[in-house]
Amino acid sequence: MSDAVHWTLEVSVNDGQLSTFKDLLNEMVSSTRSEYGTSIYEWYFNEDESICIINERYRDSRAAMMHLQAFGSFAERFMAAVTPTSFIVLGNPSTEVRDGLSGLNPRYLKLESGFSR
């Protein structure tokens, strides 16, 4: 089984916050680019840019926890710009990671079968 931890967070962009949010996401992408064990870090918008889906994958729980610690410096601005609407975590994250994510009320799904290359 894989040790990888994935998550997909869907957020609604708060009124008047799109420009601020896009500036913030660029800061976050730049910061995350150098983090240990981050293999996917992608931000997607719908056509009118009112909804964003953030797709993330980490090598293991250690890498996910390192990202959560780094996110702390962005959290206040992030939560002021958006409202989380759905959060799905895939894999088997550690208790520490689960505790770090608990404020977003995630749904957890475990890997049953398959592979990635």
Name each model-derived stretch.
Residues 72-76:
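A short, acidic, amphipathic alpha-helical segment used as a generic capping/interface helix at domain edges
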Residues 1-52, 59-70, 80-117:
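Short S/T/G/P-rich N-terminal loop/turn motif that feeds into the first structured element of a domain
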